[in-house]
Structures are given as C-alpha cells and as structure tokens.
C-alpha cells in the first residue's frame, strides 16, 4: 500500500528530478548560445569614411622580411608583387651564410640586381669552439665581400641558444663583443630580435591580453620558472647597444615596447646608435593613434618600415594605418589584435623617412635611383 511516507519520498524525488531536468535544459540552451572567441567576429555597424589602400603612397624599403627559398626563388614573380605594393627594395633577413648566402646573392645579381639585400646569419652555439671567433669574423668579411648588407640576430640568442655545457648564451656575453665591433667596422647594421611580447611570460588566463595567441600557439609561452624574465633579456640587449656605440643596431619589433611609447622614446634617447622598426607590431600602433602619431613625428629619424612575414594583402593594413585617418577597422590577424585599428594620418615628411629615407641612410648600398629625389 502506497503510504503517506512513500508519497512524500516520491514527491521529493520527482521535484529533484524536475529541477535537474530543468537545469540540464537550461545548460544546453546556454551552451548553444556560446561560441569560441575565435569565431566571434561580427561585422561593424559603424558607418564611417573608409579609405582602403593597396599601394603605398611612396616607394618603400622593407627592412624586415623573410624569404627562405631565395637561391631558387622566381624573383620576377616576387618583384611584380613588390611593384604592385610600391615596394622599391626588400631586405631578406634570412640569408643564412656560406654557400646558401652566396647562392641567394647570385640569384639576386642575375635576376633582380637592385631590388634585394641580404643579411647574413651566424650560429652562436659553437661559442666554446677555439676557432669560433676566427670563423665567424671570416663569415662576416666574406659576406660583405659577396654583397651582403647586414647581420640579422634571431631571438634564440638570449632565449634558447646554449653553449656546449647547456648554459644559456646571454646576448651580452663578452665573447661576442668582437662580432658587434666587426659589424660596425664593416658598415653592417645589426637587426636584432630579442625576447618576445612581455605577455608571453604572464599566466595564460583571462587577464592576459595575448591569451588567444598563446592558446593557438602554445609554444610561444615563456615559463618564467625556466626562462629568464622579459626585463632581464631586454637589459642584456640594451647592454650591447651601450657597449658598442660605433655599431648601428636595429631593435626589431619596436623592441617589444610598442605598448609603452614613452619607454621606447626614452630608449631611443639613451642609445643614439639604435634604430627601430615596426614589423609585426602594427597592432600596437593602430590602437593608440594620437600617441603613435606624435611618436612617429618626434622620432621620425629613428623608425624604419618593416613587415616581417611576407603576405601581399597584409601590407594593405600597414598602409591604411600609416597613411589614413580611418577609424575602427580590422587588423588582419585576430590573435595579434582582437581590437580595431585607427589611422595615424602621418605627415608626408614623416612617411618619406619611414618608407625609405631612414633606410637609405643606414643602408647606403641601396640603389637610390629606385626612390624619389626630394
């Protein structure tokens, strides 16, 4: 017989079951309204003037580019793309060394003799070898003789490169001093990429502005328990700038200080032998148009145009940020910038210096006939 006690038990059970069912239904409904952050990219409803640009206002020199197949590359196709952008000259930082570098230079000399420059690259991990310095100074001299125009230092130095004992090689290791000095003597600018965005050292959580990039590219995370801090790596880099005032350094990617232009300005004030460039950090500039515009005006003799990874369509965003007054438009890669861009509307005098004049000053072997005569 179904008694009162059992009735209450059944009522409680059904009530709990109903509540659980309602909870599950609501969770399903809630989850159905959730999308991954990567997918959320609604078209803007803002109606403002738009001035997309596919060709730079002035011929420009790209001082930060990578072409990894230069010995065999069809340069006629590449130069046609460059012409479409108004790119007068490209610096390929991935020249490597030895026979590879020679084959790169031979291809350029035969097929596009005045459109490309090659930077040589060195291997730091042989630093303990007795003939390390002799070999590397010989590489630099031979590269200069063959037609290379500078030295590119990759981020491995200071981050991941180690000596024969497994010890990290610091950027300011005194054993490398003769190389920096030799570059000054040879007239080789040193484009050096040190560290990464500071956010790569921070916890991968909701407070990290680079969370999406670290999610999509987890290898970029820098564990502070295993890797020297962002600030210590920058300090090593800045130390060589101070120690070698007769060598011209190009601090790549705005020295990862594009989010703090006051600091970057102080940095340039401290080291007159240092230039900087904007490769892969346009997103920092496009979100602070007033500050960035003033920075470009104040330091117009110290900034070079660079792009880094080569993609024709991505240059369009660079031109639009640098040349227009456009508001609230997309950057081309969400993991670098989930925010919108604003144009800096740089003055023509500043644009000319950014696009080609500053590069010509530190890379005088570039054929100036490719560029306007002011």
Where are these regions (language model features)?
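H/E-rich (His + Asp/Glu) clusters that bind or coordinate divalent metals
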Residues: 71-72, 79, 225, 230-374
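N-terminal Sec-pathway targeting helices
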Residues: 1-17
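An N-terminally biased module of ancient metal coordination in phosphate/nucleic-acid-related enzymes
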Residues: 24-114, 358
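Active-site gating/metal-coordination segments in enzymes
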Residues: 101-220
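Acidic-and-aromatic substrate-binding clefts and catalytic sites of carbohydrate-active enzymes
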Residues: 67-75, 92-102, 125-134, 161, ...
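Active-site gating loops and adjacent loop-to-helix segments of metal-dependent hydrolytic enzymes
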Residues: 33-39, 57, 162, 198-225, ...
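Hydrophobic faces of well-ordered beta-strands that scaffold small-molecule active sites
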Residues: 61-65, 89-92, 116-121, 151-153, ...
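Acidic (Asp/Glu)-rich catalytic clusters
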Residues: 52-54, 78-84, 103-116, 138-148, ...
